[in-house]
Amino acid sequence: SYFGLRSFGVGERGGLHCFTLNGEPIFQSGLLDQGYWGKGIYTPETNRGMYDSLRQVKALGFNMLRKHIKVEPLLWYYYCDILGIIVWQDMLNGGERYKQYRINLGPFINLRLNDKNFESMGRGDPKSRAQYMAEAEGTIECLFNCVSICLWTPFNEGWGQFDSLAVCEHLRGLDTTRLYDHASGWQDMGGGDVCSRHIYFKKVRLKNDKRRVLALTEFGGYSFSDKNSGKKVFSYRNFASAQDYMKAFERLYMRQVVPAIKKDGLAAAVYTQLADVEGEINGIFTADWRCKGPAEDFCRINAALYASFDLVFKV
């Protein structure tokens, strides 16, 4: 057995809000991690492989992973604990069939739905809502002692979302030691601790929320063509070569994300995504854990994020 001592919180400076670790401001630079594995699909092939994948993340300068709508074996969280990787944990969303066009329009227009309209959000059945609450409560109970978990995300992009303000406060009553991103993406009801933005098809343009931490919780999704695969796979933007991909990746961060720290008080960024999965090749690692760019380039980009943040929140 083991234990860890740490505190997660929210700090403020000059009207801008940020995350804190043990009372000190910290920029959280992370990757969206859907938890798929090359051969095991939902299950890591080996414990060593699970550990090594996390070491690779840390070696590139990232300090956070957003575990996307999946709960991992406790060993995975232990490895994050000992390696010093912060974890944002999504709840499982679920729900019934919803009006898909309402959700799919989110990346393109600011269409905010009323999440008390349970039918339109795929939560018309009271049993479905009760099942969600039971699973969310069980997730907190199961993972409560995982030191690395900083934040819970009850809902993502409106998928099965319902009464998110009340749900968030109910879960906060079960765990007051962590922060909450009550509705990650485009169905923000103004609650929780995070103003959570997903931006894919447009330039990164943000606005200081004045009450909550401003976080870019999904963006990017770049890839480059694999002419040998013969498969049609999804990415948000595709490039002709690894060199073009890496140049675009750096431009995205240096020209859009880094400036948003000083201009808007951006305090966290979660790039989509950690590794390629079936049907999506927009990871910074391939499915067999080969990095798509030089480690020093990723480290330099992350160093620029941290330096810009320190000038705003620490100096």
Across the structure, where does each feature detected by a protein language model lie?
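Active-site-adjacent substrate/metal-binding segments within catalytic domains
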Residues: 1-100, 106-114, 118-151, 155-162, ...
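Active-site-proximal beta-strand elements of phosphoester/diester hydrolases
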Residues: 27-32, 196, 214-218
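Short secondary-structure transition/capping segments
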Residues: 77-79, 100-103, 192-195, 281-282
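Hydrophobic residues in well-ordered beta-strands that form the structural core
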Residues: 87-89, 182, 216
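Short, acidic/turn-prone active-site loops that include or flank metal/cofactor-
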Residues: 91-96, 185-186, 200-201, 220
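Substrate-binding clefts and catalytic carboxylate motifs of secreted carbohydrate-active enzymes
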Residues: 133-134, 148-152, 206-315
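Substrate-binding cleft/loops of secretory-pathway carbohydrate-active enzymes
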Residues: 159-174, 182-209, 224, 274-290
